[in-house]
């Protein structure tokens, strides 16, 4: 399913992904100038690192419409079989970037054992022709198509993963019967309201980044949810999270959050990505003592008060804030034995003396292995 990027024909493309087997990860386009955590992740949304995005406005503008940016090409001819080489016993069908307009034209009913279907980056407008596979189908991936409505999936009761990201969907509907779902990806659509999730007690990951959502609501039945990705929306408050006892990761970059105090409702949180918001203080985060990774970059935070009790903290991304006191940094962070990575670039404490900045941080926090983009196998102080 690998495909080399097409030559530029003068027409705008969607996304060219060289390896569609890499699950795209939610993008927060501004994940702060090269910052990466210990696993090499830079805080961006679910887009493969090999993706070539030639219409970036699709991510930055929630009002963006790609009606005029469809790949040129003719509909599949009646006698053309794109799946001719596939065995009838195949458990995985992949047909990506092939200008498919109709799922029915693929005649999927001949494959009796299919567990996964991936039809990414096509021109599909309607979900159809999949019902005959309902008994075996577990994973349906229709990422980057032209789908406006969540219809045609009434028989798909055994799905555990559904990806309808980068489509034109406005409402989450007609999937309440998918009670086995564990992963639901609806990134970069036109969704303004979280709804229709009442029956998803087994859901562990929900991705709704790059939509038009203003409020976190209707999540209380998601008792198994571990990861919630809602970056690049219009959310102003962290309310509505109290019914998520297993939430481990919250990605809410590029919203309008000012107050962290509602986080006390999710004390089990281990990773919080809240860059590019309107934070001026970290007060309210004190009860999240299980936090291991905290990204507060690109806010207006002037001090680290609130982090004193976060003994398990491993990574702190705090670039481009208003932090200026080395003494306070040492006081708050020096006792955190697991802390290995910090980012403070773009703060007054770095801008005032960039030549001495890293050495000062190393002296204050000798347990570190990484300061900004610089990694150390062993810190040898001058």
Residue ranges and their predicted role:
Residues 150, 172, 194, 216, ...:
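Conserved ABC ATPase nucleotide-binding domain signature region
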Residues 276:
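Short, flexible active-site loops
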């Amino acid at each position: 399913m690998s495909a080399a990027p097409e030559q530029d024909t003068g027409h705008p493309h969607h996304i060219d992904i060289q390896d569609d087997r890499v699950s795209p990860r939610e993008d927060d386009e501004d994940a702060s100038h090269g910052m990466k955590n210990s696993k090499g992740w830079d805080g961006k949304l679910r887009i493969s690192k090999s993706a070539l995005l030639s219409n970036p406005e699709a991510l930055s503008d929630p009002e963006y419409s790609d009606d005029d940016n469809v790949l040129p090409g003719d509909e599949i001819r009646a006698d053309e079989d794109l799946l001719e080489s596939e065995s009838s016993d195949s458990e995985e069908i992949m047909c990506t970037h092939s200008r498919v307009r109709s799922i029915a034209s693929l005649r999927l009913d001949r494959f009796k054992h299919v567990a996964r279907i991936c039809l990414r980056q096509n021109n599909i407008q309607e979900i159809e022709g999949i019902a005959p596979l309902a008994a075996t189908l577990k994973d349906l991936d229709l990422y980057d198509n032209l789908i406006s409505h969540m219809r045609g999936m009434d028989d798909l009761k055994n799905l555990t993963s559904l990806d309808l990201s980068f489509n034109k969907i406005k409402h989450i509907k007609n999937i309440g019967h998918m009670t086995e779902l564990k992963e639901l990806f609806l990134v970069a659509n036109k969704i303004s309201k979280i709804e229709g999730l009442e029956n998803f007690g087994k859901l562990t990951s929900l991705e709704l980044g790059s939509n038009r959502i203003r409020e976190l609501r209707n999540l209380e039945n998601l008792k198994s949810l571990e990861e919630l990705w809602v970056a690049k929306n219009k959310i102003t408050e962290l309310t509505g999270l109290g019914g998520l006892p297993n939430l481990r990761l919250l990605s809410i970059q590029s919203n309008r959050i000012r107050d962290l105090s509602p986080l006390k409702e999710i004390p089990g949180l281990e990773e919080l990505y809240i860059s590019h918001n309107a934070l001026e203080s970290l007060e309210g985060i004190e009860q999240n003592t299980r936090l291991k990774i905290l990204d507060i970059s690109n806010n207006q935070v002037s001090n680290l008060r609130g982090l004193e009790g976060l003994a398990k903290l491993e990574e702190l991304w705090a670039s481009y804030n208003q932090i200026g006191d080395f003494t306070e940094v040492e006081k708050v962070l020096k006792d955190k034995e697991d802390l290995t990575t910090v980012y403070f670039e773009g703060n007054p404490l770095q801008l005032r003396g960039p030549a001495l900045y890293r050495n000062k941080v190393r002296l204050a926090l000798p347990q570190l292995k990484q300061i900004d983009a610089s990694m150390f196998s062993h810190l040898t102080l001058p």
